[in-house]
Structure formats: structure tokens, C-alpha cells
């Protein structure tokens, strides 16, 4: 057969095959190919992880190109649960879409829309009340009755200028929250108190996990040496809570309810102590601990000062179900809320927002902080909100962040910060004893829970239901 005749036959076969295809098949193209076409058509650069997008295809790809780049990218990416964000004059990133994170630009637009709805202090207070009630209702906390707060203490020890004692609180019948209380060794009268929840910081052993980590011990002990009582406590289904509930339950929505409830009960406990000044109670935590900081401050006026660290963001809602696993940001009959609005509910109470340059708080000085100042201005109290931004720091509660917090708390709660400063005036944490995790176990090495301790989330749900009767 002659070559020319062979080519003709092949072309005819190809034509017949194409004629037998549906439009969906004809226009189906690999995403990588489509994105390259976008770059060529609009003269832009798209940055993305090829492995992350591997195997994805675009239906009716050729028909998703419009006169403007934005519409084109929306039509291509949204059906695939992808999103884009402008990062330069003609460059964009393409990433997976997650329900708990938006783009920086969308976060800024959201704040702009929200602030326009607060004509004055009165309208803000109305919105604040609605958001607060929504947080309580969605978590199922509104109707929960408080049971007697049983307190179990163990392993009291003394260190340089402070003491530590392990404490478990029975926050619901048969449900225990474990923590450690740090106090100054010597004090007179009533002293300030701080809640210290932790975030999602992991280690190979308990010594590097959650509240047992050195950074949490440093901040609690240093505050105690300065003159405050500090309650450091574990997240739900972490630490000793995992003796009752499997750690996997931490990553479910019930964890959000329990962590908020735990913070409320910690407040109850601190307010019950005769040596604690109820007018000087604050809270600070990083990452997921920052989320807990904002939520408890938003819903409970007993918190008089807050320091949310590496968490407050207009576009990031918290990547764990213990932070965003329930629709606490979705307001019926009103615009959606976000963590900046939650944070603003602290106003006019003192708040320090600590941010860094390597996570979702990287734009805080430009986006979130100016917005917060506008809310505080409604009360004439702009001086009560501050931002310490550390552009070269990473996502943690490291020394640079801790010293900013020490200074802020000392100024507002009249703590004796000179006690923990060296001759140059720099904060010195060398007098803190870093304990192994086992020293902080309320139920000891034997992990002996009280006899009435429940086990499993099904039992917990029944207890919660009983608390609403």
C-alpha cells in the first residue's frame, strides 16, 4: 500500500472516531495542558505543584476561556476544588481549595464588607451579640448546665520562684480536664491569672507534645515568677484526655464544643480561688491555642485580656475540626463571620495580636490589625489593641513571641517583670525548670482515672445531652 493512501485511510478512521465522541469527550483535556494554554493566552505565569494536580482533567476545556483571566480561572478551577491567588504583576498560584481557608485578597474583601455594616458602636454591639449567641448555639453550649466542679490535685513541687501542681477538673460528670497550675512562691493578696491552652504542636514523645512542650512551660513558669497564677491545660483527646477519648476524636466537631466548654470551666475554677483577682484574668495560646483564646474571649467577659498568637487571620479559619468543624462562623440572616471579627469581640479589653511572616498571619500589619483598630476606635480605646509582627519568625510560640506577651501582660496586669530580666533589661527564662511530661501527669504514671470516668464519645454525647435537661 502506498504511503499516501495509508495516510488517507488513517485520517478517515480518525475522523470517524472523533465523530463518534460526545462533546464532553472531545473537549476533555488534562489540567496541566489547560493551565499552560492559560499562561500562553493571557501572558501570565501560574505556579502550582504538578504532583498535587496530577490526574485532574477539565471538562469542556476550550469553552472555559473568556475575555478576562479571572472568569477563565474560576470556570476551570472551581469545579476541581482548586483556587488561585495573585502574587505578582502577572503571576498567580494555583492551590487546592479547603473549606477553612480563603485567599488573602478574599479575606481583605470580607473585612471591608463587614466594617461597612458597623455604622457606630451601637450597631457593632448588636452584631457582636448575634455572633456571640451563634458561637454558643452552634456548639450546643447555650443550654448546658454546669455540674459541681470537682478538683483533683497531685504532685505539688517547688522551683526557682514558682510552684507547679497538677490539677484535673471534672468539667462534666465523668469527664476530666487535666492541667498544671503555676503560681509564684511568694505573694500577698489577690493576683492575676492566665489561661494557657495549647495548639497543634507535635513531638516524637509526650515531652514534645501540647502543654508538655518546653515553650509552654517557659511561658507559664515565667508568668508565675512575675506574679500570676497560670492554668496550662490540654486540648480535648490530647494528653490525659486521650485516656478517656481516642485521639482521633480530637479531629471531629465534638472537640470544638469540648474545648470551648473546658475553657469556660477553667474560668470557673480560677474565679473560685480566693487568691485570684477576677478583674485580672487573661488568656494566651498559639495556633489552635490561639483559636481557643479568641473564642473564649469572644463569649466570656470574665476574660479581661487576650494574646492570640500566630492565629488571627481574615482568610484562615483553623484547619482542624476542633477549630472550624462546626459552623460557628456562619451567621443566620447575616454576613459570615471570621476569626478577625471573633478577635475584635475582645474590644475594648486589652488585646495583643502576635503574628509572623511565614504563615497565614503574614499580612496582619497591613490587613487585620488596621481593621481591629477601627473596632477599638468605636470605644475610643485604640491604645488597648497592639500588634507585634515578627517577619522572620515561624509558626510557634518561640522566645521572641513570649517576650512580647510578657511585656504586654506585665503592663496591663501590673506584674513584676524586673524579676525575670537580666542586667541589660532582657527577659531571662534560664530560671525555669523544664520538666518531663510524666511530672505533669495529673493521674500519674499509672494513669489511674477516677472510678466515674467515662470512655468514648458516645458516652460523652449522652453526658452532654443530660447536661441540657
Placement of each model-derived feature along the sequence:
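Bacterial Sec-dependent N-terminal signal peptides
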Residues: 1-25
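N-terminal export/assembly leaders
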Residues: 20-98
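Alpha/beta-hydrolase-fold serine-hydrolase catalytic core, especially in secreted/extracellular enzymes
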Residues: 96-176, 354-469
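Glycine-rich active-site/cofactor-binding loop and its immediate structural neighborhood
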Residues: 155-212
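Carboxylate/His-rich catalytic cores and anion/metal-binding grooves
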Residues: 177, 181-182, 193-194, 217-233, ...
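Cap/lid segment of the alpha/beta-hydrolase catalytic domain
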Residues: 188-272, 312-322, 328
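Primarily recognizes the serine-hydrolase "nucleophile elbow" in alpha/beta-hydrolase
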Residues: 268-335
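The feature captures the conserved acid-bearing segment of alpha/beta-hydrolase catalytic domains
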Residues: 317-377
